[in-house]
């Protein structure tokens, strides 16, 4: 809705703008396709560029310079120097292969921390995601034995290994029924993963 705001003097049906959206592939796999479909249905002449959130994308500077229109992501503490809109919250769960021992017998905190985890590659050296930030706040650390920069590939890696992916339920549920994976509750309570849109 922010992209189509009348306050910007914008007529969707005739506009020929290019919308540049910074986003990661860790969103629900249907979120960005639905966003693109909505933009194309309301503004058919507009172009859309999805830019990956990475160390190479200084989203604050690019938002300020008008090089990116909106950034979509999840932050434990979103930046307070930008406009912010909450999109949705999601329960934190773990995705495991259907033959993972925890799928049969469950796990306690110690077993969950010790098992082999897979996580996205940090966007820059020293960066941590919301999962590890929360664990740090509890004085805990999980055993990350694999990292991948392409979040969309991780569920297939989980399906063929004993690796555990911990992220939002909506993301995980998209793969149940398509891959031999199942969703398990985390033995540690996490706050909901909040997804935001940011703009200048």
Where are these regions (language model features)?
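Alpha-helical linker/hinge and terminal dimerization helices associated
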Residues: 1-12
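Central regulatory/effector-binding core of bacterial HTH transcription factors
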Residues: 15-79, 148
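Secondary-structure junction motif
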Residues: 74, 102-105, 109, 116-138, ...
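A ligand-binding cleft/hinge motif common to bilobed small-molecule-binding domains
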Residues: 75-80, 129, 151-181
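Flexible hinge/capping segments at coil-to-helix
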Residues: 12, 79-117, 200
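Short beta-strand->loop
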Residues: 83-93, 165, 169-173, 177-192
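A late-sequence structural motif
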Residues: 31, 103-104, 109-110, 182-200
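Hydrophobic residues within well-ordered alpha-helices
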Residues: 21, 62-64, 112, 156-159, ...
